[in-house]
Amino acid sequence: MFLVALDRTILATAIPRITDEFHSLTSVGWYGSAYLLTCCALQLIFGKIYTLFSVKWTLLWSILIFEASSALSGAAPNSTALIVGRAICGVGAAGIFAGVVVCIVHVVPLHKRPQIQGMFGALMGVSSIVGPLIGGGFTSNVTWRWCFYINLPVGGVAMLVILVFLKIPDQPTAQAPLSEKIKQLDIPGTVLLVPGTVCLLLALQWGGQTYPWSNGRVIALLTLAGVLLVGFSAVQVLLPRTATLPPRIMKQRSVAAACWATLTINCGNYIIIYFLPIWFQSIKGASASESGIRTLPLMISMVAGSISGGTLNTKIGYYTPLAIVGTCLMCVGNGLLTTFEVDTGAGKWIGYQILYGLGLGLAFQVPNLATQASLPKKDVPTGLALMLFATLLGASVFVSAGENVLANQLVKRLAGVEGVDISLITSGGATSLLQSLPDGVRKIALVAYNEALREVFRVGLIPTCLSVLGAAALEWRSVKKPAGKVSAEDGEKETKNVDKETTEKT
């Protein structure tokens, strides 16, 4: 899990050197997008696979795919090969994300999972901090290719440990004939879901950046995505027995609330993570590495909130209060970020980040816990895959939205400023443009840029506030499984009866 989390951030500081070597400035966006497209599109599919095949061997195959694609990316002779390697890497990452949380479900008792998930949350925070530092170190002192090669020895050790020590009983369906498993894989749904998700993400990546939103390519992609995803939903309803996302899962109150909370938390969070460093670089004149250091208060407080939240959850049992408190703190922290001025001091931007980070640490693991506590064990892999899908989708949608809002606001606010070339802003050169302006004009442009970024933070505030609704809608279940109450994990009979009834109907 650490390798996959690290892989998302380690490349950031290496990209300039990669573009210099491959002369591929126009391909920069695809180094991240190719990974995101396959990882997001296949997340729900892996949730289904883990319910049918051996958890241990599916995870091992996923790591092997991740390792092979890392080797391909590291040895890439050109930009195209690197993009292909990143796309295959996303396939392995999708399997690893789902596999690790499924292993936790099988190995760790429910009442101890909050602490484990808190540790994983801390791991994600640490990877966000050290990833760019490691990537910069490899790029400066060895070669950017070691950003990928580092996965090989570490992943090899992980595979060996899993092979020898991980003991997970096979699913009942693991012994079924391969032909029967393939029938259960929801081929019609997969054929609709994967291209539908890819079309949606491509439209969001291209819209307003590569092409205007009115461009025929973007409109066609959005239309096709809508048709395919509606078709996928219809298949899930009409063929529930083999559905990738059975309707009974989405009808469960806590799962629906958790999905909403996950989506909205990540929509707002990725706005902060992506645009806060831009504020430091453009408004405060920080370098790329300095802006990373200045976001440490957010990352460290998130790690602290995640660990303390997991410990507290284990003691009190109930996770809903943590979700409510956490999302409320996020709202306050995000709201304060929208008050940034050009001369905002360190005390404020550090304090605002700490407030937001603590809330994020308390809240962002709760949807996964709610899913595990609310679903029968056989449905947990699918439920967790849904949460991961919502995470990736939220990140994609709102980073794209934020980029468009920033570009539009900059054009609107700087169009009348003398000496400002609007074409440089729309091509992504606003920060360097500010530094080249005369002092008098620069002050005006700086205020305009700050106002534009505040608008972006306001965009992130909307889903952050909406996440409180998802947190409040969660059922009050305890991970301690109080005596006399049957937990969702022990409700296998109920689910089997539902499956039996569904089979008879079909």
Curated annotation (Swiss-Prot):
Residues modified by glycosylation: N78, N141
Compositional bias segments (type: Basic and acidic residues): 487-506
Domain of life: Eukaryota
Transmembrane segments: 22-42, 45-65, 88-108, 118-138, 146-166, 187-207, 218-238, 260-280, 292-312, 322-342, 349-369, 380-400, 456-476
Region named Disordered: 481-506
PROSITE patterns recorded: MFS (PS50850)
UniProt-listed CDD domains: MFS_Azr1_MDR_like (cd17502)
Keyword Translocase: no
Protein location: Membrane
Membrane topology term: Multi-pass membrane protein
Keyword line: Glycoprotein, Membrane, Transmembrane, Transmembrane helix, Transport
Pfam families named in the record: MFS_1
Family per similarity comment: Belongs to the major facilitator superfamily. TCR/Tet family.
Function statement: MFS-type transporter; part of the gene cluster that mediates the biosynthesis of the tetrahydroxanthone dimer neosartorin, which exhibits antibacterial activity.
Protein's name in the database: MFS-type transporter nsrN
Lineage, highest ranks first: Eukaryota, Fungi, Dikarya, Ascomycota, Pezizomycotina
